[in-house]
Regions:
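Helix-turn-helix
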Residues: 29, 37-71
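Short linear capping/connector segments at secondary-structure termini
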Residues: 90-94, 123-132
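Amphipathic alpha-helical linker/stalk segments
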Residues: 79-102
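Generic hydrophobic, amphipathic alpha-helix propensity
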Residues: 23-34, 51, 76-84
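N-terminal intrinsically disordered/low-complexity leader segments
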Residues: 1-25, 209-215
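Amphipathic alpha-helical packing segments from all-alpha helical-bundle domains
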Residues: 86, 101-116, 132-157, 165-169, ...
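Hydrophobic/aromatic-rich alpha-helical bundle segments in the mid-to-C-terminal region
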Residues: 122-126, 134, 154-201, 211-215
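Alpha-helical DNA-contacting segments of helix-turn-helix folds
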Residues: 38, 73-80, 87, 140
Length: 215
């Protein structure tokens, strides 16, 4: 996998890099406030002044780290991705199954975040705003596929290849469409589409993909 394609992080997206823990905590408060607002009212209602008020900060503090709402949302999308990858890796920590079954944990975590993670449904990983929201050189699903490849490689002890990233991106594109449909009409998600997503991921990894031969 191309080592130069790094996964976007909150720290890399803020205007002023947090040096002290207090600054990092303030950024978390701003992102928490933004997530709470879009969870209730959607992305279009988000304003700098509302984020400042809800977080107990001044507008100047918001601008210190985020020059505009777009940059704040980009950082929130990156944090969603960080939370997602952390949770998937934790779910796989004691898993003894072959790595080709690991996408069950990835799908289950995505579903749980859709249902329970504040603000995730409104923003996801930023693709609801722009298909290249996290990185202008990659599609959002491309960034997502690289994150999954990194998790699998670290957990199961192999170096992700470009072929693996491509195959995972194909799966992500398919799964993304099914997940959008699952939550389009059902707030809790239509289990038929969710189960079909699991089934397709397992089948693709087992039968179709040119992937590393590891256990």
């Amino acid at each position: 996998m191309n080592d130069q394609q790094e996964i976007p992080t909150v720290q890399g997206l803020v205007r002023t890099e947090p040096i002290q823990q207090r600054s990092a905590q303030r950024i978390e408060m701003l992102l928490d406030a933004a997530a709470e607002i879009i969870h209730v009212s959607g992305i279009d209602s988000l304003t700098t002044s509302d984020v400042a008020t809800r977080s107990g900060s001044s507008v100047g503090v918001v601008y210190r780290y985020f020059p505009n709402i777009q940059s704040l949302l980009r950082a929130l999308a990156a944090r969603n991705l960080e939370h997602y990858t952390d949770r998937v890796f934790a779910a796989l920590e004691n898993d003894q199954h072959a790595w080709r079954n690991a996408l069950d944990a990835a799908i289950d975590t995505f579903v749980d975040m859709y249902r329970n993670h504040v603000g995730f449904r409104a923003l996801r990983f930023g693709d609801v705003i722009n298909d290249r929201f996290l990185d202008p050189t990659l599609s959002n699903n491309g960034v997502f596929a690289r994150a999954i490849a990194g998790i699998l490689g670290e957990k199961y002890g192999f170096a992700p290849t470009d072929d693996l990233v491509f195959e995972l991106e194909v799966i992500v594109e398919i799964e993304d469409a099914l997940m959008k449909r699952a939550f389009l009409l059902e707030p809790h998600g239509d289990e038929r589409f969710i189960e079909k997503a699991r089934e397709i991921a397992r089948s693709y990894l087992r039968d179709s993909a040119n992937l590393p031969d590891v256990s």
